[in-house]
């Protein structure tokens, strides 16, 4: 019996920025399937812009933000939407992963703690910054750990950024700070989302 995947859910894109004609775009996607993951090539398009294609993925039973930071545009991007140039579902093999939930828990034991949002004053102006401590509680080393940082005011997304941490060793704890040069509204919550494809052969 071939099971049809539950379609990916996608929220409408957010657009932030405008300082020096640079904009940040992002959209949240969610995969409700328990035994299927997807890889894809995506881009953002609109009435007056189109970004370059980028490869991405989403694991089973997960949600994440797809981001495009620093888009150069003389005018604010209009009618933005997330589109896929290619998209493939992959079923998780019971033979290869007899207990995928356990496999995921063991491999993605990356947690962010002591998350704070604040401001730093410089001669060039004030910077917004997020600080956090990333702990790799797994038995695995990671050459790179891409991380998405999502800022909220209540339930509303008000900004995002990314950082990639290099050479995170098993059981390592690392303090990290990420800055924003542009102004931001009051932030009440910060999500730190490590983004590692543990199913990429």
Regions inferred by a protein language model and the residue ranges of each:
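Beta-strand signatures of extracellular beta-sandwich domains
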Residues: 41-45, 146-150, 193
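A cross-kingdom feature marking solvent-exposed beta-strand/loop segments within repeated
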Residues: 14-15, 22-30, 37-39, 45-75, ...
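Terminal connector regions
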Residues: 1, 55-58, 69-118, 158-162, ...
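N-terminal "mature head" segments of proteins
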Residues: 1-25
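Short solvent-exposed loop/turn micro-motifs enriched in small/polar/acidic residues
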Residues: 8, 49, 142-143
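Surface-exposed interaction/gating patches
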Residues: 19-36, 100-158
């Amino acid at each position: 019996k071939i099971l049809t995947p539950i379609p990916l859910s996608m929220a409408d894109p957010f657009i932030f920025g405008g300082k020096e004609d640079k904009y940040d775009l992002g959209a949240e996607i969610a995969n409700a399937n328990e035994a299927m993951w997807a890889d894809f090539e995506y881009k953002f398009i609109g009435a007056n812009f189109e970004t370059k294609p980028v490869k991405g993925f989403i694991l089973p039973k997960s949600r994440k933000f797809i981001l495009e930071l620093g888009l150069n545009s003389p005018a604010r991007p209009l009618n933005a939407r997330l589109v896929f140039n290619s998209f493939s579902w992959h079923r998780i093999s019971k033979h290869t992963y007899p207990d995928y939930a356990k496999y995921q828990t063991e491999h993605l034991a990356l947690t962010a703690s002591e998350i704070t949002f604040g401001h730093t004053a410089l001669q060039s102006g004030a910077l917004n910054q997020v600080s956090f401590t990333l702990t790799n509680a797994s038995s695995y080393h990671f050459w790179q750990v891409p991380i998405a940082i999502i800022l909220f005011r209540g339930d509303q997304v008000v900004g995002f950024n990314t950082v990639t941490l290099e050479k995170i060793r098993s059981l390592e704890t690392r303090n990290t700070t990420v800055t924003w040069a542009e102004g931001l509204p009051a932030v009440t919550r910060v999500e730190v989302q490590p983004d590692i494809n543990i199913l990429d052969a």
